[in-house]
Design a protein with these regions (language model features):
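Conserved, structured C-terminal
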Residues: 1-184
Length: 184
């Protein structure tokens, strides 16, 4: 057995000026790229895939560089093209993810959750003819309701400047009744 890992490096370009920056560098076609759609091509000798997706409520493109040795070249190309737009480098922003209602696997949910618990019940079609694993269990949860539910809460306390690494227990009279999964 030989394991072959793809040489792919992701870079996100997001924010209100992301479409303008991407069009300046790659062409106006990026405006027509649908959400969760992608295009694979070669830009000035740099093999890339551009996808219209994102992990915040902001307009976002993900660039998948298919040759790590071209990373600096791609970064400089984007950076120079964005100077007139007053762009800046950033990192993951949990606030935007939470405000946008975007779930993160292991932060907000895991394999023990069902769609009713995490607000994804709109994706379930129990009336379809086709059978699928868990259909009867989901039908029962649909009738009885979920035992727990992911929800937001606002707590008046001192500000939290870092997101929590672990789920923190929620207690009532010393009994664990839930957990705080992602906080900002």
């Amino acid at each position: 057995v030989e394991v072959d890992e793809p040489d792919v490096s992701p870079l996100q370009v997001q924010g209100p000026k992301s479409a303008e920056l991407m069009a300046n560098v790659f062409g106006d076609w990026v405006h027509d790229l649908g959400f969760y759609r992608f295009k694979e091509f070669n830009h000035e000798g740099i093999p890339i895939v551009i996808a219209r997706m994102g992990y915040s409520r902001e307009l976002c493109y993900e660039i998948f560089l298919q040759d790590h040795s071209k990373g600096d070249e791609l970064w400089e190309c984007l950076w120079q093209a964005g100077q007139d737009l007053n762009i800046s480098a950033g990192g993951p922003n949990i606030i935007l993810r939470l405000e946008g209602g975007i779930l993160s696997y292991l932060s907000d949910l895991d394999r023990t959750n069902n769609p009713y618990e995490v607000g994804l019940d709109w994706m379930i079609d129990l009336d379809q003819e086709d059978d699928f694993i868990g259909k009867e269990a989901l039908r029962e949860i649909n009738i009885k309701g979920p035992l727990k539910k992911l929800m937001g809460a606002e707590i008046e306390a001192d500000p939290i400047y870092e997101s929590n690494e672990d789920h923190l227990p929620v207690l009532i009279d010393g009994k664990v009744v839930g957990s705080m999964n992602a906080m900002v």
